[in-house]
Regions:
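Active-site helical microenvironments for divalent-metal-assisted chemistry
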Residues: 1-169
Length: 171
């Protein structure tokens, strides 16, 4: 192999190692996963959740430059892999909507019902309190996680999938 080709191959390999492992982040990929799971998902509700989240996040982009909606889709895909229900998948698609857009929990409740609204609200509340003291923050995070689990463990599962996806993009 000529020296120039070796250098190019080495540069490409080094660049590839710096890139995060891509996850399928299209809604079509999520729908494929939903269908392939063989579970009885409420596609109408999940489609409506995607449409609301996609419209709400339409002008937002991640640091990578990809549309923001790719993150909620990836979180929803993780939940499908775990065998979670339609309400959890819909809530995952909208988990940042109330926090980062003008859409309110009341609007989500009107369009999707109390169960989905409670899940979205629970995930939102897990991230809202800010602390300057690390020990206080850790204690409060533990308290919030325990409270969320006592109300509906799905809130914690959605939040953990959210954190997992955020950590995967930095690998």
């Amino acid at each position: 192999m000529p020296e120039e080709a070796k250098k190019n191959a080495a540069e490409q390999a080094a660049q590839a190692q710096k890139q995060p492992v891509p996850m399928p982040t299209t809604y079509e990929a999520l729908r494929h996963d939903l269908i392939a799971s063989g579970r009885a998902y409420d596609f109408d509700m999940i489609d409506r959740a995607y449409q609301l989240a996609s419209a709400a996040h339409a002008t937002q982009f991640r640091r990578s430059g990809e549309p923001y909606i790719c993150h909620p889709i990836s979180v929803a895909q993780l939940l499908v892999e775990l065998g979670m229900d339609s309400e959890s998948v819909a809530a995952a698609l909208m988990h940042d909507v109330a926090e980062d857009t003008p859409v309110t929990i009341d609007e989500i409740r009107q369009k999707f019902g109390s169960e989905v609204a409670l899940l979205v609200d629970g995930v939102t509340k897990l991230t809202q309190i800010k602390f300057s003291n690390v020990e206080d923050r850790k204690a409060e995070n533990l308290r919030k996680m325990l409270l969320a689990m006592s109300q509906d463990v799905r809130v914690m599962i959605i939040k953990l999938c959210d954190r997992l996806h955020l950590s995967l993009i930095h690998i």
